[in-house]
Amino acid sequence: MRTIAIDAMGGENAPEAIVKAVLKAKNEMPETKFLLFGDKEQLRELIPADQINDQLGVVATTETIADEDEPVKAIRRKKDSSMVVAANFVKEGKADALLSLGNTGALLACGIFIIGRIKGIVRPGLMPTLPVQNSDDGFNMVDVGANAKSKPEYLLQWAEMASYYAQKIRGIDNPRIALLNNGAESDKGDDVHQKAYELLKDSDLNFVGNIEGNELLLGNADVVVTDGFTGNAVLKNIEGTSSVILHLLKDSLLNGNLMTKMGALMVKGSLASLKSKFDTAKYGGAVLLGVNAPVVKTHGRSNERPIYYTLKQVDKMIKEKLVEDFRDEFSEK
């Protein structure tokens, strides 16, 4: 039986939203065990007694890592926090994967320092799946903040892992890999990006060249590789812009005159389709590529729905033996 360790105390809607998602997923994933780490009393109040069985368990912890906690200090000082105890279960082989909605930096630290890097991987990278305009498939972008500074060889390894993820988990044959840069020409960018371009071009990947920021959501690449600083800034920009556009549309239509409101009714289906395009819940969470088990971060404001999809994502990563394949591939290099 596959086992997912879940930090039940992380995120704005914890633990209620997490428990709801687990109970829903539990009924659809009979070969998967869910271990919830957190305040025993709170969790017991939310979980019906008849649901606690071989497929669902609670591991009592007494501490929680807050968003404002300094990541590395937090995982060292809060040994009995839900996140750290869950990470240690994965490290000790008592669970196969770790999921959290909590402090991103602390989760990255748990992945790197507790669960550990795969031999041969220089630096793990954080990778979400983001929307595109012409498809429901979206695209992967890595790194979005696990590393403040990057080297060309890091970008190559992230591209290799992300390409394999796109094939195994997203079902994309021969994924198109692009390098985020400030121009399409091969000589664009600083020294890191120019050298990364050459490494990607000379690899066995389906490298399609540089991609600029204004092309990211057009669906011209299945995987976009970038340094962590730029990737994090771009991710926040995409999230913020999407939210603002949808809010402005809604506000304009609901607060307009009678003709505007009548027009809104006529295009209701199209607006729902637009909202669906920018709905990232169906993609699951951001994956920390390059550590010894699946470690996945879901947005801290998530409700039941994105958590449910993330549980399905994590389960598939375990089932497809993604990390084992990474280990076989990179330990030989």
Swiss-Prot record:
It is found in: Cytoplasm. Its EC number is 2.3.1.274. It comes from the Bacteria. It holds the Pfam family FA_synthesis. GO terms for biological process: fatty acid biosynthetic process; phospholipid biosynthetic process. Keywords: Cytoplasm, Lipid biosynthesis, Lipid metabolism, Phospholipid biosynthesis, Phospholipid metabolism, Transferase. GO terms for cellular component: cytoplasm. InterPro entries: FA_synthesis (IPR003664), Phospholipid_synth_PlsX-like (IPR012281). Its main location: cytoplasm. Pathway: Lipid metabolism; phospholipid metabolism. HAMAP family: PlsX. Belongs to the PlsX family. Catalyzes the reversible formation of acyl-phosphate (acyl-PO(4)) from acyl-[acyl-carrier-protein] (acyl-ACP). This enzyme utilizes acyl-ACP as fatty acyl donor, but not acyl-CoA. Homodimer. Probably interacts with PlsY. PANTHER family: FATTY ACID/PHOSPHOLIPID SYNTHESIS PROTEIN PLSX, PHOSPHATE ACYLTRANSFERASE. This is Phosphate acyltransferase.
